[in-house]
């Protein structure tokens, strides 16, 4: 294989890491839909609810940091969850700048169904427990870099 063929092979979309991640992410999110629709949740709302099931009340900042979402993304999600009667948002009496998120009784009632979904998704992925753990660790390593990201050159 000559050098040009090698370069073209590396450029092929199916060989791109970003395309593999994009395709896998889309598939996994689609796998969630039949489980989330009966709960009235979108995938991002589901992630917020899982974060809240770990303990409440929590600040918007804490949830955003855990999920890697900024306030501009998280606030509309929380407004929709609040409109659905699943969460409440209140100002922290100790620090008015902070907004506390808590589960309502309706939000708590979804806990068992929502918390059973990750296991169903893992089963649908048809990977061994070891492969799932390795994949999760690898993806977390990409999502949460251990050190500063190197400067990318665009030339």
Segments the model singles out, each with a brief description of its role:
Residues 19-22, 26, 30-70:
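N-terminal helix-turn-helix DNA-binding core of bacterial DNA-binding proteins
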Residues 34, 38, 54, 80, ...:
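Conserved amphipathic alpha-helical interaction elements at protein-protein interfaces in regulatory
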Residues 29, 57, 79-137:
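Charged, amphipathic alpha-helical coiled-coil/dimerization segments
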Residues 124-126, 145-154:
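Amphipathic alpha-helical linker/stalk segments
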Residues 1-39, 133, 141-144, 153-155:
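N-terminal leader segment of winged-helix/HTH proteins
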